[in-house]
From Swiss-Prot:
Plays an important role in the elongation step of protein synthesis. This is Large ribosomal subunit protein P2. GO terms for molecular function: structural constituent of ribosome. It holds the Pfam family Ribosomal_60s. InterPro entries: P1/P2_N_sf, Ribosomal_P1/P2, Ribosomal_P2. It comes from Sus scrofa. GO terms for cellular component: cytosolic large ribosomal subunit. The modification Phosphoserine is found at S17, S19, S79, S86, S102, S105.
């Protein structure tokens, strides 16, 4: 992702076809070490393409990805009722999971940018 971001910054900054040297320079300026193989892969995939078209295609692909909330709602009607003995155990597990999530979410203020 860092290579794509650096490529996009260079392209949007006026460099129509950024080279590996351009991207490496941008990454080095923020203290990120560049992997030559990944860098060359990004350049070969994006070289000669219109950045606006690539962004539009990406937005179209993201629109087709289901969000996290819809899956839980869709699963609820199809699930069978659990046995009476297992319900308290399931409730305890859910409480424990919620506690763990709340501790983790404090680190990133409840929003995981790279999750």
């Amino acid at each position: 992702m860092r290579y794509v971001a650096s490529y996009l910054l260079a392209a949007l900054g006026g460099n129509t076809s950024p080279s590996a040297k351009d991207i490496k320079k941008x990454l080095d300026s923020v203290g990120i070490e560049a992997d030559x193989d990944r860098l060359n892969k990004v350049i070969s995939e994006l070289n000669g393409k219109n950045i606006e078209d690539v962004i539009a295609q990406g937005i179209g692909k993201l629109a087709s990805v289901p969000s996290g909330g819809a899956x839980a709602v869709a699963a609820a009607p199809g699930s069978x009722a659990p046995a009476a003995g297992s319900a308290p155990a399931a409730a305890e597990e859910k409480k424990e999971e919620k506690k763990e999530e709340s501790e983790e979410s404090d680190d990133d203020m409840g929003f995981g940018l790279f999750d």
